Design a protein with these regions (language model features):
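ABC ATP-binding cassette signature C-motif
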Residues: 1-254, 304-475
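Leucine-rich amphipathic alpha-helices with coiled-coil/heptad-repeat character
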Residues: 101, 108, 124, 131, ...
């Protein structure tokens, strides 16, 4: 029996159908990779499956007693609480039961309290609740997290680990993960792959990391303009099946278009069409017109181009014996020169100080010792990991070009609505607030703004987070 069944699901956001009467089911031990363009409704669907949001219409059924855990795209924690306290929230129900058991154990006994103690005992045993502290500590140890450190001092990757730990300690039957690899370093992603493959429950995850999908998924489910389609196997298998499907669909559409054109010529002749025996043919023509009108044409492609600034000097940045420490050394005696035309990748584990090093190179923070010098005629476009530059109350149009309907790209004027359309934001959405966008759409908007500014140095801190597969390939 399926763990979760979604039937005739409908969900709309404004004039856009995110779910258009679609179906979905999840079986035991399945690991489903949910894919689709940014803004198609993947995160909304995941929240609906996890019981956090409601459908407009349709039904959602769960197997009785099903335990679920959900990890958000950008987990929110109290920055002053410790890692141990945050992860313990994953066993809040177990903690409450054990506290009640301990209170009843020392209270005056009667038939009701005795019956309640038996109930709690069986619940705790079924949820492995007697040793929840040990489970939390073991999980933190596996994820290399210090239980006593404050959340606010953690990097983006380590905060994601805390959210994963919080979900895992709940021992769920189904794990829902929204962009689980965001902010994780390469070793952490490999570790997460192994963890999910060994996980005994079912997994539904959203990610645009193709290698991760290949390693983890047993099935790919694509959300495309309100409809869910399932493909067995991993992402590589999906690509092969999808290519065949697109080719078959194109052939069928071409045949239908040819037949429709022939029938339109016939109906315009008029005389034959008035005969009684032609009624069936007229009905077929109407049906062909309906099918053509309802056809879901291929989605547009994003157009990425960078507005080039003035040519920079030969040296972009020069670092000489640079050191920087906070509670520990981050950068120690580092010397490097970055030249015009270089493409530099910064690698390192979560919390190692990659973002700090970026800021040292850019001059937004000063080294404790040594010198960091920017070259001449440098125009920097900076894409930051925490997306601090987003004004959620601004409209898309105002965010891209404040106070003007026009922007200049490589010396040519372009209307801001047309420019937004290059990044797959329809003209109708140009006046929507930024707050209505999904995580991936917000990143696409940031890229649109970034590329609209003349620049000769691009600085990208985790640029691929939340972006869909098509956009990633173009980037």
């Amino acid at each position: 029996m399926a763990l979760i069944v979604l039937n005739d699901a409908k969900l709309a956001f404004g004039h856009v159908d995110l779910l258009a009467g679609t179906q979905f089911s999840l079986e035991s031990s399945e690991r489903i990779g949910l894919i689709g363009r940014n803004g198609t409704g993947k995160s909304s669907l995941l929240k609906i499956l996890a019981g956090l949001e409601k459908l407009d219409d349709g039904s959602l059924q769960y197997q009785q007693g099903l335990r679920m855990a959900y990890v958000a795209q950008e987990p929110i924690f109290d920055p002053v609480e410790t890692v141990f306290h945050a992860v313990s929230q994953g066993v809040a129900e177990v903690k409450a039961l054990r506290e009640e058991y301990e209170e009843l154990s020392v209270a005056e006994w009667n038939d009701d309290s005795h019956h309640r103690l038996d109930e709690i005992q069986s619940q705790l045993e079924s949820m492995s609740g007697w040793n929840w502290e040990q489970r939390v500590h073991e999980t933190l140890d596996r994820l290399h997290l210090d239980p006593d450190i404050a959340i606010g001092s953690l990097s983006g990757g380590n905060r994601k680990r805390v959210a994963l730990a919080q979900a895992l300690v709940a021992v769920p039957d189904v794990l829902f993960l929204d962009e689980p690899t965001n902010h994780l370093d390469l070793d952490s992603i490999t570790w997460l792959e192994e963890l999910l493959k060994a996980f005994k429950g079912s997994v539904v995850l959203i990610t645009h990391d193709r290698a991760f999908l290949d390693a983890v998924s047993t099935q790919i489910v694509e959300l495309d303009r309100g409809i869910l389609r399932s493909y067995p196997g991993n992402f590589t298998a999906y690509e092969a099946l999808k290519e065949q499907e697109i080719a078959s669909e194109a052939l069928a559409n071409a045949r239908a278009d040819k037949l429709l054109a022939q029938e339109e010529v016939w109906i315009r002749k008029g005389v034959e069409a008035r005969r009684t025996r032609s009624v069936g043919r007229i009905a077929r023509l109407e049906k062909l017109r309906e099918i053509r009108a309802a056809r879901r044409d291929a989605m547009g492609q994003i157009k990425l181009s960078v507005a080039s600034g003035n040519r920079s000097g030969k040296i972009v940045a020069d670092l000489e014996s640079v050191s920087k420490s906070y509670d520990r050394p981050i950068v120690k005696d580092f010397t490097a020169t970055i030249l015009r035309g270089d493409k530099v990748g910064l690698l390192g584990p979560n919390g190692a100080g990659k973002t700090t090093l970026l800021k040292l190179i850019l001059g937004s923070i000063q080294p404790d010792s040594g010198t960091a010098t920017m070259g001449s005629q440098i125009d920097v476009a900076y894409f930051d990991q925490m997306r601090e530059g987003l004004d959620l109350n601004a409209t898309l149009e105002d965010y891209i070009s404040p106070g003007s309907e026009w922007i200049e790209i490589n010396g040519a004027r372009k209307h801001v609505k047309s420019y937004l359309n290059d990044f797959l934001f329809s003209p109708e959405r140009a006046n929507s607030p930024v707050s209505t966008l999904s995580g991936g759409e917000r990143n696409r908007l940031l890229l649109a703004r970034l590329f609209a500014r003349p620049a000769n140095v691009l600085v990208l801190d985790e640029p691929t987070n939340d972006l869909d597969i098509d956009t990633l390939e173009l980037l």
